[in-house]
């Protein structure tokens, strides 16, 4: 079975290396970006099953990345974009959902095991949506 491709866009080196290691150990292929500009360039190439996007980053924040994708979609379709943030109940999160983010994970609250569970859930859901003709008719 082909490994799911994850793009991790995270400027904090410790968090980025931790998430990379945890996800690789769980059987995912992980590419990383160190800031929003680097992340946007990789997202535009496309082909990722899931994108984990930090909100607060230098050069270009997560919301600016999401806005750019609305104006210039990727060459190859990507799976869902899930925010990585330490913000909870914040207007920034609502704004991100309005810009097509599919979820958010609070970095300070999530354990490595929970991260893997969430990533599996998002990658499985996106595969179901793409490959299942039932998904369209049953969405409520």
At which residue positions do the language-model features occur?
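Short amphipathic alpha-helix used as the core "switch/output" element in two-component signaling
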Residues: 41, 63-76
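The feature encodes the CheY-like receiver
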Residues: 16, 58-61
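Conserved acidic carboxylate
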Residues: 10
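Active-site residues of response regulator receiver
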Residues: 54, 85
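Acidic catalytic/metal-coordinating carboxylates
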Residues: 4, 35-38, 61-67
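Acidic, metal-coordinating helix/loop segments flanking the phosphotransfer/catalytic sites
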Residues: 32-50
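Charged docking surfaces used in two-component/phosphorelay signaling
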Residues: 17-25
